[in-house]
A protein has these predicted regions:
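C-terminal amphipathic alpha-helical interaction region
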Residues: 192, 203-266
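Internal glycine-rich alpha/beta core junctions
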Residues: 1-226
């Protein structure tokens, strides 16, 4: 065993900023990468399932024509598109924050620019665990349904879906399990960050034929707000932690719903 005592070393960065700033910045970057990986694996799962469902015939027709199968495929596509929309919105926040941060190193930002940088940093911090947590869970669900649509064949190496299923599983584990993403995201539930974003999305223009869907999201947001208020009013940390996953998932579903409407409008 080799031990160094009182050895001189070069300090990388600033003192007492290692865990708070540097490690979390590294972790968030990795989590965003895994969110992107999750979308990629989810896309592969959907394509494999769709291709097989079109080719596989049973009782004289392709199995994609059976309601049980096309319902699964529809849900897979919805989860894929939703997680991709959330990923792109998250990367937009990160890009805007990083751009302003880089500019601030070369020249002094105006007051409005500093406020804007702080806003994008907050949004990036809020959406990163959401994109990783929701994206990786949707990825696992799509990989599961891909195997399910293949039936017994999906368990065999003759088809790619068994490998996709294995590839998907790690996404909800490394760089923080889904449970840890909930821990990172719950403070943005209790402080109102996600609710404020819902209100922001509600104010943006969408196609007239999508208004009924937005109204449903507004109703969901009202329910979400009541639940968050009721849970946080207890001021019981354990009680809040117990319901954290459900509240984070509610926020994720509503936000992704708004993003899908905005993407459809564009």
């Amino acid at each position: 065993e080799l031990v160094f005592r009182n050895a001189k070393a070069e300090l990388c960065g600033d003192r007492k900023m290692g865990l708070i700033k540097y490690v979390m910045a590294l972790m968030n970057g990795a989590r965003l990468g895994i969110a992107a990986q999750s979308v990629g694996v989810s896309e592969a799962a959907y394509r494999e399932a769709l291709s097989y469902a079109r080719e596989r015939r049973q009782f004289g027709k392709a199995i994609i024509e059976f309601p049980a199968v096309y319902e699964m495929l529809s849900l897979m596509k919805a989860k894929l598109d939703a997680s991709r929309s959330l990923l792109y919105e998250t990367t937009r926040f990160v890009d805007m924050y990083k751009t302003l941060e880089d500019i601030s190193k070369e020249s002094k930002l105006e007051k409005e620019e500093r406020a804007e940088m702080k806003m994008y940093q907050k949004q990036a911090d809020a959406f990163t665990p959401l994109a990783k947590g929701m994206g990786s869970e949707f990825c696992n669900q799509n990989a599961y349904d891909c195997v399910q649509i293949h039936g017994g064949s999906g368990f065999m190496k003759d088809y790619a879906c068994e490998r996709i299923y294995r590839d998907a599983r790690i996404t909800s584990i490394y760089e923080g399990t889904t449970q840890l993403q909930v821990v990172a995201a719950i403070r943005h539930v209790t402080t109102g960050t996600y609710l404020n974003m819902m209100k922001l999305y509600e104010s943006q223009e969408i196609s007239p034929d999508l208004i009924p869907l937005r109204n449903r999201l507004k109703t969901m947001a009202e329910t979400y707000e009541r639940i968050v208020t009721k849970v946080t009013e207890t001021k019981d940390p354990e009680y809040i932690d117990f319901h954290a996953r459900r509240m984070v998932e509610m926020a994720g579903h509503i936000i992704m719903g708004h993003l899908l409407l905005l993407d459809t409008t564009r």
